[in-house]
């Protein structure tokens, strides 16, 4: 059996689920990780009803650093080669900074930043030994703009973008691509559960984003932004004065 796998975090719903379905459709074996075991089982069942691949499930809360150690150890002990790691798991919150519980803010940092860093730290050496691999870190269009009322979330995604690009320069000499992929607003439960107000945004279909991400990963694109409208936001943030971008983005968030 082919022991090469694509590992996807946050795979029980939304973008992660769509990515799992897309990679499965292309014959990729999967390691799916999320907190909710029942939802993972449903994703697996639905995929295997139409795809002939191998799927491993791990029910872990990646905001717990020990869980990441257990995940990596399980992959090693089962001789699963992670040829592609997709760090998709993340959480967010919208509101005035001190109106959001500090614990919630710290959880955003723990999952969106610390867990992602540790996943890279543990799995990159294996890819380095193999002389090949792809790490795809899912950032966000908010990485380009300091969104008021999403201060910690947007800042966490700015970290992901900067970290990923720096990491790519370090590891490309080993045959490893570290890709940054930026979705915009997507029609998933993530945005509703985070309390984001989306009345001014036309959200993308997660399946459409998954197809885009698959192509970007297979073509080893180092940096990708989904949808033309999101590319315009990134360009707008780049060419206009920082003060102007900050003020306008705050009005957009209200």
Question: What is each stretch, according to the model?
Answer:
Residues 10-14:
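Conserved glycine-rich cofactor-binding loop
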Residues 26-42:
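Conserved glycine-rich Rossmann-like NAD(P)H-binding loop of the short-chain dehydrogenase/reductase
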Residues 88-93:
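Conserved NAD(P)H cofactor-binding loop of Rossmann-fold oxidoreductase domains
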Residues 180, 196-234:
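C-terminal helical subdomain
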